[in-house]
């Protein structure tokens, strides 16, 4: 059975391609998801994508992932800096997760430099543009294989 990754995108990421292209680029979320699915398939991994602008919907989707996915790749968007609820959901389901950001959050406003997720993530990828999703999926796939060997 192929490994399973859930890709979660948080608020405003549905506006990729048109929202602040100088920061986030011109690639759309549909493009990101298509590229992520292609990358996952090349690694013999099944990828499901989910996006929501609502914290509770993200929490619910994480809960639904318990026992159904092997890893989560999450770009929490602005919830990175505010959501204890999403953090607790991730910890509650005990699924390894990779935190990813399109921009380098450490080179932006001071308030963007704190993450409620980084200390619990198996990896954090930021500042690579949308390529960060490819890197996150590849890392998650490798992490799952290494975990299976232990």
UniProtKB/Swiss-Prot annotation:
| Gene Ontology biological process terms, A to Z | 3,4-dihydroxybenzoate biosynthetic process; quinate catabolic process
Keyword Lyase among record annotations: yes
**Quick one: which pathway?**
Aromatic compound metabolism; 3,4-dihydroxybenzoate biosynthesis; 3,4-dihydroxybenzoate from 3-dehydroquinate: step 1/2
Presence of keyword Glycosyltransferase:
no
Q: Binding of substrate: at which residues?
A: 75, 81, 88, 102-103, 112
Catalytic activity line of the entry: 3-dehydroquinate = 3-dehydroshikimate + H2O
Q: Which cysteines are joined by disulfide bonds?
A: none
Mind telling me which Pfam families this protein's record contains? DHquinase_II
CDD domains attached to this UniProt entry: DHQase_II
Active site (UniProt): 24 (proton acceptor), 101 (proton donor)
Q: Which InterPro entries does the entry mention?
A: DHquinase_II (IPR001874), DHquinase_II_CS (IPR018509), DHquinase_II_sf (IPR036441)
**Residues the UniProt record annotates as site (Transition state stabilizer):** 19
Q: What class of enzyme is it?
A: lyase
Task: State the EC number(s).
Answer: 4.2.1.10
Gene Ontology molecular function, alphabetical: 3-dehydroquinate dehydratase activity
Q: Which UniProt keywords apply?
A: Lyase, Quinate metabolism
Oligomer status and interactors: Homododecamer. Adopts a ring-like structure, composed of an arrangement of two hexameric rings stacked on top of one another.
What does this gene product do? Is involved in the catabolism of quinate. Allows the utilization of quinate as carbon source via the beta-ketoadipate pathway.
Q: Give the protein family.
A: Belongs to the type-II 3-dehydroquinase family.
Q: Which PANTHER family match?
A: CATABOLIC 3-DEHYDROQUINASE (PTHR21272:SF3)
Q: What is this protein called?
A: Catabolic 3-dehydroquinase
């Amino acid at each position: 059975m192929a490994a399973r990754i859930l890709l979660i995108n948080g608020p405003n990421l549905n506006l990729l391609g048109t929202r602040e292209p100088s920061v986030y680029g011109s690639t759309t979320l549909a493009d990101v998801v298509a590229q992520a699915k292609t990358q996952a398939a090349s690694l013999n991994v099944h990828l499901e994508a989910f996006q929501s602008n609502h914290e509770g919907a993200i929490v619910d989707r994480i809960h639904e992932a318990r026992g159904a996915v092997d890893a989560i790749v999450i770009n929490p968007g602005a919830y990175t800096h505010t959501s204890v609820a999403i953090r607790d959901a991730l910890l509650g389901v005990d699924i390894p997760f990779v935190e990813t950001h399109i921009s380098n959050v450490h080179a932006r406003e001071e308030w963007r430099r704190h993450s409620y997720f980084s200390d619990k993530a198996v990896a954090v990828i930021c500042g690579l543009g949308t390529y960060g999703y490819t890197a996150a999926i590849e890392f998650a796939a490798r992490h799952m294989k290494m975990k299976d060997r232990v």
